Every structure is written in structure tokens, then in C-alpha cells.
Amino acid sequence: MKLTIAKSAGYCFGVKRAVNMVYQEAEEAKVPVYTYGPIIHNEEVVRDLKQRGVHVVRELKELENLPKGKIIIRSHGISRREHEAMKACGFEVLDATCPFVLKIHRLVEKYSKEGYRIVIAGNEHHPEVEGILGWVEDRKST
């Protein structure tokens, strides 16, 4: 049997960028390093990062009891409210949101402010969809 691996096999560039950012911070940071949610849906990578001292924060309220440090936003992105809450807690926020996802955030923010209704096809509980919806001013549908 012949096995052929597609040229595009592996992580997209946004995920690679986010994972590389966390590994770099884990090696260089002089303060605690956290990720908001697992940086990637890959338990092996998450486990390796944990061994390097990176902790996963699953809810914003956890930040209140953690030593201040750097928190890295995963490639899925987050809502405006979450972003502001992280800064308000005194953490240095490093944004590893995929540039394509950031573009979507800016577009839904712009068009929702102009009165457009934003409709997103997807699982409303998926972190990327939650993040996108978090930049919609008012009217939205999923």
C-alpha cells in the first residue's frame, strides 16, 4: 500500500504561530505563562507545555487567584469582554489569534456597528465562534 501525505498536512499557519509563541514564552519568560484554554486540540502538545511550566486557564475567574504573568490567547481568538477582563486583572496579554480570525473580528465589529445583523454558521459553543460573536455589537444569529 502506498501512503501519500498531502502538502498541507499538519497544523495551519495560525496554529503553528500560536504554538511556537507559547514554546518561546515558556523558554524565555521570567514570569508565569498561561494559555487561555488549551493552545491546541492536541493533548501531547498541551502535556509537553505543562511540563515546561505553561498552565491552562479555562475560565476568567481563575485569573483572580493566579500569580501575575503572561497569558496567551489561542488561535481561536476571544471576545472583547474576555480581552478587557484579562488586562484588568493585570496580566500581560499576548494575542496569538490567527490573523484570519482577527480579520473576522474586525469585520463583524465594523458591520454590526453599522447596523448589519451578523449570522454565523457554526457551533455557537465552539471557542472560535464564541470569540467572533464577542465582537458583535448587538444583533447576531448562530
Enumerate the language-model features and the residues they cover:
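Generic N-terminal amphipathic, Lys/Arg-enriched alpha-helix
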Residues: 1-10, 28, 32
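Conserved phosphate/anionic-ligand binding catalytic regions in large, soluble enzymes, centered on
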Residues: 8-22
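Short internal beta-strands
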Residues: 32-39, 120-122
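N-terminal beta-loop-helix "entrance" segment that forms/cooperates
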Residues: 37-54
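Short acidic low-complexity segments
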Residues: 56-66
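Conserved phosphate/oxyanion-binding catalytic-loop motifs
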Residues: 74-79
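Ser/Thr/Gly-rich flexible loops in soluble cytosolic domains mediating phosphotransfer, phosphorylation
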Residues: 89-116, 120-124
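Conserved small/polar residues in nucleotide/adenosyl-binding loops
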Residues: 142
